[in-house]
């Protein structure tokens, strides 16, 4: 099947999952540029559409790609201009005088991440500094300017959507911009684990070790996911030691500090504490306004200050939700064919802004509502029972816990009888698929969400 045929199938599948207006506005004119390195490079008309697809339809497109080609592949979104820029850079490299051949290192050269695989937006220049992230930004910049000489390891922790990944990508961009020959790997601990398991299964552990131990900078996201994984922790311990002893930079991110990562080996915990530990906290009002203003400035948009003020006042939890709210308002304005006003902004965000909460949603709240709906006792959510009448409501409760709370995957698993985070991921993926395939079930879940939010 050609790439054009693949994309036609993807669009046909995606069209069934979105409204006609959304399809015409955001999906109809997209193209599949190519499949490369487990990524589907999708071309869009402009930054606005690219951002909207990334924020709202990435999972739908990912599922459609899986159905079209038979294996998982992640969509990434570029504008025509960005692709031309990348192509120009590649041509410049091709026109450089031929250099002596570098020594090939098995498992490294084909796996080392180049700058084009980092998010092009996530640089130090685009990072908005405020009281909650000033120290992490300064530490990250120091590490990028002098790898392994400033803070090693650098451990960044904080809640979802606060800028940890942005800083890690920024470090990668900076290092490669100043030393194109540097070997930089950015990965998540989950991917590290999966690669390690595959290397054992395929009898290629030495190749895996060459990949991760013969580099200059290792950027590893969401390290908390290696808790409970003894073999992965053992492997990462030795990888950490080899890199550190070779004076190579290690940057780690997590949703909590090392001391709060349960079931993490003490020897790893102590190594994470060798360098500098910094935390990112939610942005204050001034920082939220600065983020919104920078965003509209980058995209050359004209939005009234009153509308931005409304967004900044209503969305306070994290940057990802803040930018998502702005994207939602822009899309709503475009679909309605109306200029952005405070009233239109409020209308666009009414479904994601709840009335002032009397209390924060807890996993216990979710278990209570789901239990009442499906006649399941709260204690059964934590039990080992696997009968469908209990197992399926448990999966729904796990899905809602991930959607409606900021708790980490391990924490959610812990609240459901100490289950592994992969069980939570599986439950979430199953319910997402069932929602997509069954309109009646989708309405059922939406009703549960409303009841939980309004309790």
Swiss-Prot record:
Q: Which residues bind ATP?
A: 161, 163-165
- UniProt xrefs under Pfam families: Bac_DnaA, Bac_DnaA_C, DnaA_N
Q: What is an example of a GO molecular function annotated in this UniProt entry?
A: lipid binding
- Quick one: where's region Disordered? 85-104
Instruction: Report the locations given in the UniProt record.
Output: Cytoplasm
Q: Where is this region: Domain III, AAA+ region?
A: 117-333
Composition bias type Basic and acidic residues, residue spans:
85-95
Q: Where is this region: Domain I, interacts with DnaA modulators?
A: 1-74
Instruction: Output the superkingdom of the source species.
Output: Bacteria
| Free-text comment about domains | Domain I is involved in oligomerization and binding regulators, domain II is flexibile and of varying length in different bacteria, domain III forms the AAA+ region, while domain IV binds dsDNA.
Q: What is this protein called?
A: Chromosomal replication initiator protein DnaA
| Organism expressing this protein natively | Staphylococcus saprophyticus subsp. saprophyticus (strain ATCC 15305 / DSM 20229 / NCIMB 8711 / NCTC 7292 / S-41)
